[in-house]
């Protein structure tokens, strides 16, 4: 009976994995097809021609550059603000601390379309022109929450006696932070930064409301779906996006596991 249960769980797990990843594998497969507009299964033959076409496409390179700059900038801002907010919530006592923590994390739970509409309304009411910074600010709403969530979780597992011992030995606040607290939270900061970068790089819903006429890589992919002869190139770009976001997520997961074990 127990063996049957285990077999059923394994079968269900494999079915879920297949349901989630087979569509991605199909996209990867058709990035190498020799066909330019239609899809046959299996592909008549395989080629890497579309990779050079994608790389030489000025729109793709422009969108990639914008996505990279936005992701790096949003991640840097998120790490600074998220870490400072986590330190303030962790070390100080004030009325409404739980409410502040909830408000910081809230953007993760909100649907992207709600955040996008709210930000677009604020931008329009403020007569702010759409620019690189409107995208960065919109991505920062959830990137800060990701960084904060990782850092505050690690801080709560850090013994306050370490900081007290450092201060008793004559270290000032900066020395205590640099030599005692920072080594403790560094893995969480790196993991939070990687997750924030991955989320920012492939974000499309919020970006659609705050980018104006600018095209990030996910927006370029979405707009290219209506062009049949762009499909192999679109698949190549999608493959690149998946690879670029998959690596930071895997590394962040490993860092988080290592941190939990210490």
Regions found by a protein language model. Give the residues of each.
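Transmembrane-helix boundary motif in ABC transporter permease subunits
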Residues: 1-6, 72-104, 117, 121, ...
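Non-cytoplasmic
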Residues: 30-38, 147, 189-222
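Interhelical loop and adjacent transmembrane-helix boundary motif
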Residues: 2-5, 38, 48-60, 207-256
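Transmembrane alpha-helices
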Residues: 11-12, 17-24, 106, 140-141, ...
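Membrane-embedded alpha-helices of multi-pass transport/permease systems
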Residues: 22-25, 29, 80-84, 117, ...
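N-terminal, non-cleaved signal-anchor transmembrane helix
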Residues: 1-58, 62-65, 69, 256-262
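Membrane-interfacial helix termini and adjacent extracytoplasmic/periplasmic loops
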Residues: 39-42, 48, 97, 113-143, ...
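C-terminal transmembrane helix and the adjacent membrane-cytosol boundary/short C-terminal tail
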Residues: 2-11, 152-163, 167, 173-180, ...
């Amino acid at each position: 009976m127990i063996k049957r249960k285990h077999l059923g769980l394994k079968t269900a797990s494999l079915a879920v994995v297949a349901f989630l990843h087979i569509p991605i594998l199909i996209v990867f497969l058709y990035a190498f097809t020799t066909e330019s507009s239609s899809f046959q299964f299996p592909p008549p033959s395989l080629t890497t021609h579309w990779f050079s076409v994608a790389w030489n496409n000025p729109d793709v390179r422009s969108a990639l550059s914008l996505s990279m700059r936005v992701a790096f900038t949003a991640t840097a801002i998120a790490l600074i603000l998220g870490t400072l907010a986590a330190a303030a919530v962790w070390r100080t006592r004030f009325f409404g601390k739980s409410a502040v923590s909830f408000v910081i994390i809230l953007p993760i739970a909100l649907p992207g379309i709600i955040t996008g509409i709210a930000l677009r309304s604020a931008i329009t009411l403020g007569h702010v022109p759409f620019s690189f910074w409107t995208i960065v600010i919109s991505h920062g709403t959830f990137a800060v929450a990701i960084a904060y969530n990782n850092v505050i979780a690690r801080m709560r597992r850090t013994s306050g006696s370490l900081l007290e011992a450092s201060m008793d030995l004559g270290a000032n606040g900066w020395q205590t932070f640099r030599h005692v607290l920072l080594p403790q939270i560094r893995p969480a900061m790196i993991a939070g930064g990687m997750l924030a970068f991955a989320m920012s790089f492939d974000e499309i819903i919020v970006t659609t409301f705050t980018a104006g006429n600018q095209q990030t890589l996910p927006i370029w992919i979405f707009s290219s779906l209506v062009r049949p002869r762009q499909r192999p190139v679109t698949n190549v770009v999608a493959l690149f996006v998946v690879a670029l976001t998959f690596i930071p997520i895997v590394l962040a997961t490993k860092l988080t596991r290592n941190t939990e074990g210490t």
